[in-house]
Amino acid sequence: MNSTRITSCIAALLLALLAGCVVPPGSPTGLMDVAERPAEKALLAGMRAYDDGQYPQAEQSLNQALTAGLASPKDRAAAHKYLAFIFCTSGRVPACEAQFRAARGDDPAFALSKAEAGHPQWGPVYQRVQR
């Protein structure tokens, strides 16, 4: 009976020690926190400029975002994707190809949506880079 009590005490001690090792969750990062980082702020500005048809401004902001060091591989891939779109639509096909390759390099899961991949200007370039 004594060995059962010792085993129970050891088990309780181990559980107590393990409970002390649990790392409390950090506070979640919100959009407003991320939007204040220079690289992420430049990415958002570039995406807005692109959506507004301000392609030279979008190109500048997206390059600035990449230079400033976007933390997320998905964010870097998004910046490269928008740059690829800009380059393809302005006839800079080699630069477009390079941006699609860079997007895939930063995020191996990178893929255009079906609608994006079907675009007449950058769709064929994207398909060629995927081979």
State where each predicted segment sits.
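Sec-dependent bacterial lipoprotein signal peptides
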Residues: 1-23
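Bacterial Sec signal peptide processing site at the extreme N-terminus
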Residues: 15-39
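Boundary/linker segments of alpha-helical solenoid repeat arrays
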Residues: 72-76, 105-121
